[in-house]
Amino acid sequence: MDTRRLLRTFAIGIGTAGLLISGCSTGGSSPNASATGTAAPEGLTAYYTQKLSWRDCGVEGFECATMKAPRDYDKPDDGDIDLAVSRKKATGPGKRLGSLLVNPGGPGGSAISYLQGYAALGYPAPVRARYDMVAIDPRGVARSEPVECLTGKEMDAYTQVDQTPDDEAEVQKLSAAFEKFAQGCEKRSGEILPYVSTVDTARDMDVLRSLLGDEKLNYVGASYGTFLGATYADLFPQRAGRLVLDGAMDPSLPAVDMNRDQTAGFEGAFQSFAADCVKQPDCPLGTTSTADAATNLKQLFKDLDAKPIPSGDEDRKLGESLATTGVIAAMYDEAAWPQLREALAGAQRSDGSGLLSLADSYYERSPDGKYANLMYANAAVNCLDLPPAFDTPDAVEKAVPDFDKASPVFGRGFAWASLNCAYWPTEATGTPHRTEAKGAAPIVVVGTTRDPATPYKWSQALAAQLSSGTLLTYDGDGHTAYGRGSDCIDTAINTYLLEGTPPTDGKKCT
């Protein structure tokens, strides 16, 4: 699994891909003072002292277990939630340093799938040698009582609704789609929806830390995983060990500002793609200038809005919404640019299969028409963590010019996608605020200068907010930096994880 495809727009709206972004949630009660020591927080002793029963996962080298946590931390006697955990023990050589918890982002990304499919195999060997690599699927995600909302057919319809309404009828259709999505989540998963906040998951992580026998939590979080890690450090500063937050978010921003910033981030990523594309003899957007490339892409979107094209799936045609998602999916990693060029060329020949394949990968849709619960969990967490970016369609329409200014290519779609939480059945419990984690050990925040999903300025902001934050910069394209080929980045992070020595604040790598 590629971490660079896991962050989703806060709006998780129709077609407009992008990333999450939820600011720092304050939902749920904070632990009392006893949480800063080794004792369990009041009323939670049974959870902190349970025994994990490890078993074979059916995946070579990995063990799995089920951890119980209170469904409602405010009322721990009101029932449990079962959370899936997996680990791969340190390979050696060298002295074991404890556990390293990993999270790929989302929200809604399966940390266990990420661990088993990438982290425990692809993280630098010196790190895997000395840490047990561990993951927990957050509540509401994948193996941990997953949120469900729509059938596969319903989700197919949802992803094809026009995301850039041109008249009142289209606005009503889009609003109805958001409302149906929210109603489906309430119908199928209403009992868990109030209890999947980032604060809840951060508290689950502390229970797991205790059960693993670690005095402090060591952690690598990418994308939304940075928000989760920062939340943990804010709740449990004395228990925060070596934390790496790669591709960070600014938890002080409200949803509308986050979405607009992200819109600009994807515009910048497209400009990088276009600058590369026009140098290629086969660039389907022209070979003259990035401005012409942008004009040609917008014209393609307009044509697909008016007349969707065959996609290779007889039940789905490629319209503007799915095409936009396909393009944005390729913005996460420059390695996908050749695939995007081919897909765009195909669309110009009325073959939408390439862009549809990119969109399906983004949505985690399998060939049999089934969807993973990524997008459902994404909405559930985001809509609980922050108040809606917009409450009404009129509010969106007023904001469209600002979004268009941030991104002439994607702005309008991102603005309308930001409406979805207005229909959510559970009121948000979090609010944006500065995250300082006073008293925590040094925390390394990694930012990529042309990151589309988590703009670089967010990493700068989080590093400045954290009382012990250290900013490590990768000057490059794509989403996140660790393990992406920069020896400078990898060496700095490995040294921190293995020796506890953070890089110099402000260090820059290429």
Located regions from the model:
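Flexible "cap/lid" loop of the alpha/beta hydrolase fold
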Residues: M249-E267, A343-A345, G352-P367
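Bacterial N-terminal signal peptides that target proteins for export
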Residues: D2-I14
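Structural motif
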Residues: I309-T324, Y332-A336, D368-Y376
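Long, low-complexity segments enriched in small/aliphatic residues
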Residues: S353-L386, F390-D391, V396
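Bacterial signal peptide processing site
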Residues: S25-G28
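Gly/Pro-rich cap/lid or specificity-loop segments adjacent to the active site
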Residues: A33-L322, A380, L384-T510
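C-terminal motif of bacterial Sec signal peptides marking the signal peptidase cleavage site
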Residues: L20-G23
